[in-house]
Each structure stands twice: as C-alpha cells, then as structure tokens.
Design a protein with these regions (language model features):
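Alpha-helical transmembrane segments
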Residues: 1-173
C-alpha cells in the first residue's frame, strides 16, 4: 500500500513479481501459471491507464489485494523465503515509513522537536522533494527534484535487478 504513491509504481513492480512467479511456477506442478499470467495481463492492461499522467488509480483495495496475491503465489509454489529479496522494493518502502516514524518520535522525545531521516516517507516521495536531509547529500544533488516518471523507471530497474538476484539465489539452492 505504501508503494502506491506514484503513477504506475505499485502495479509495474507487481508485474515484475508476478512474472517471476509465472516463470518459477512452470518448473513446479502447482498449476498456478494461468492465474499468474492472468494477474500479469490484468496489471499490464491497468498500467495503460495508470502510468504518468494516470487517469485510473488503484487505491487501497487494489494494492492490498496485490500484496495478498503475491503472498499466496509464494506459498503455493513454496518459495516464501525468497519474498524479502524479490519484493525488496516493497520492503524498503515499508521500512522507510517505519524508520521515519520511530526516528521522529524518538528525536521529539529526546530533543523536544522531531527530526527526519528522509524528506518524506515512503522513500519514493523523498526523491520528489527539494533540499538535503540526513543521507540525502550522498544520494542526490542539493535541491534537485527527480521527476515522477524517472523515479518509477528507477524502481523498475531495481525490481528487475532484484528479480534476477532472486532467480540466481533460486538456482544456487
């Protein structure tokens, strides 16, 4: 749900994850390949209207359902332990929110005012805000705002890299 903040972000990353499950399911006798292909097809159709500038939005119901579908796919093909690698984008997005919240509350209690690790959480919104905060000086030029479409493409590339790492991990076992 936290990843559904930019046009096409949650659905495009889920296409990568569902495609991975389709490829892996072919080697098993689970019989979920038609379902995984249907999810990929539905998301690709949805992406036509959800990429920047989006005219259709997923909402909480859609994003939470996709999370449940990912979990069910992993359980059916017995690859639950690969979820932290494969779904690393979703994991980092959620961790950024938790880190920001806990750090803000901790610094508010300690210093009387809350401080931030990121300019904004979840992480994808951090790259949309100008200025430097925390580790920002190492990642991005000062006052450099990254366009929404570039952020989504970078997350796609990271998702592809994570899927390849997951396949390599799967083959090493």
């Amino acid at each position: 749900n936290f990843t559904d903040g930019l046009d096409g972000l949650a659905s495009s990353v889920t296409v990568l994850v569902a495609t991975f499950f389709t490829v892996v399911a072919i080697g098993t006798k689970s019989g979920i390949e038609p379902i995984t292909c249907a999810v990929v097809g539905a998301l690709l159709g949805f992406l036509l209207f959800n990429v920047y500038p989006a005219s259709v939005f997923m909402g909480d119901t859609g994003s939470l359902t996709l999370g449940g579908i990912i979990a069910v796919f992993a359980i059916i093909i017995r690859k639950e332990l690969l979820i932290p690698i494969l779904c690393g984008i979703f994991l980092v997005e959620n961790l950024s929110v938790l880190m920001q919240t806990f750090y803000f509350k901790y610094t508010k209690k300690k210093y009387g005012e809350g401080r931030r690790i990121f300019k904004m959480a979840p992480l994808h919104h951090h790259f949309q805000k100008p200025g430097n905060v925390g580790i920002q000086a190492l990642i991005q030029k000062p006052f450099n705002v990254v366009p929404e479409s570039k952020i989504v493409v970078r997350f796609w590339l990271i998702g592809i890299i994570l899927a390849v790492i997951t396949i390599v991990t799967l083959k090493m076992r």
